[in-house]
């Protein structure tokens, strides 16, 4: 890489997506970076497109690349820069100039979207991550095929360990699909489901240990998650509520809460076994090790609290 400015753009540029309002990427962003030619990279500006467009989570595609570059030129002008000052653009197939940034990770057989999540938590609030032991977990629902066409043929979730100044990358499991399918099934966002799980005391226990032999590494997770959530929900919804159930909540809300309590426990079980395996494999000491997590599921409060209380890691790097 030569010194100068670079753009990473997590956007969509497609006429059909724009006209039909097809949403393939949410929370679209553009980042401006500066590389000094040595070892230092600086984030100059970070533009969340929802703050420009007013669209919450901005999933709207640009009509075409011309529309994108018109906006980019306007944004760069604010920094006294132009398109001619940009060495390279990454992150969106229709506009990126090269894919060299992915070459380092090509042999991992892990979707790059997950690798990107992992690297973001690795450097979150820590410009020198190689100075201490660290566990990295990219806990997301799925990859991004918008710029990596074979993403769905790879392992979905990236894990990593930094030890003795070296980074080792490997595939891990993520329970995020359990939550994304629950969102679709119950028509409630993941945060609402988390809150509802603890809002009432209603508990209808399901033997989640029966799922211990099911793995959650790749595209097969989509079908597995649906079957698991449906099975738990069928059991719970066919059960009677306790007589002292809180009358402020409907029967449906009580039963969704009971379903999600089981999903919370299963999610913790999945992440826990991955963390235990990593600690054992790399002979790590939790109170001397940083836990770094990113991806949509890394915002799962019940699981995060469980991990923090159980392992007492040295520190935590979890981007909001």
Per-range role (PLM):
Residues 1-320:
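Short acidic/glycine-rich loops and adjacent helix/strand connectors
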């Amino acid at each position: 890489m030569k010194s100068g400015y670079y753009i990473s753009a997590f956007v969509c540029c497609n006429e059909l997506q724009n006209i039909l309002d097809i949403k393939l990427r949410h929370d679209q962003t553009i980042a401006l970076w500066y590389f000094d030619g040595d070892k230092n990279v600086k984030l100059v500006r970070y533009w969340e497109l929802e703050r420009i467009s007013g669209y919450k989570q901005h999933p709207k595609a640009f009509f075409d690349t011309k529309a994108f570059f018109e906006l980019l030129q306007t944004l760069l002008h604010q920094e006294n820069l132009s398109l001619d000052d940009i060495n390279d653009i990454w992150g969106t197939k229709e506009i990126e100039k090269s894919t060299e940034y992915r070459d380092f990770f090509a042999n991992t057989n892990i979707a790059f979207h997950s690798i990107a999540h992992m690297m973001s938590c690795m450097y979150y609030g820590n410009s020198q991550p190689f100075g201490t032991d660290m566990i990295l977990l990219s806990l997301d629902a799925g990859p991004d095929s918008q710029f990596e066409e074979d993403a769905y043929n790879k392992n979905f979730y990236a894990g990593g360990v930094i030890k003795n100044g070296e980074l080792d990358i490997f595939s891990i499991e993520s329970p995020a699909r359990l939550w994304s399918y629950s969102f679709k099934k119950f028509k409630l966002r993941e945060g609402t489901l988390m809150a509802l799980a603890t809002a009432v005391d209603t508990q209808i226990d399901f033997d989640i240990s029966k799922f211990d032999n099911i793995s959650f590494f790749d595209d097969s997770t989509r079908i597995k998650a649906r079957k698991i959530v449906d099975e738990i929900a069928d059991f719970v919804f066919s059960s009677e509520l306790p007589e002292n159930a809180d009358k402020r909540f409907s029967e449906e809300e009580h039963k969704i809460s009971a379903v999600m309590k089981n999903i919370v426990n299963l999610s913790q079980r999945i992440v826990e076994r991955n963390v235990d395996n990593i600690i054992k494999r790399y002979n790590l000491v939790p109170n001397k090790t940083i836990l770094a997590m990113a991806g949509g599921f890394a915002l799962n409060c019940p699981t995060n609290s469980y991990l923090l209380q159980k392992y007492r890691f040295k520190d935590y790097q979890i981007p909001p």
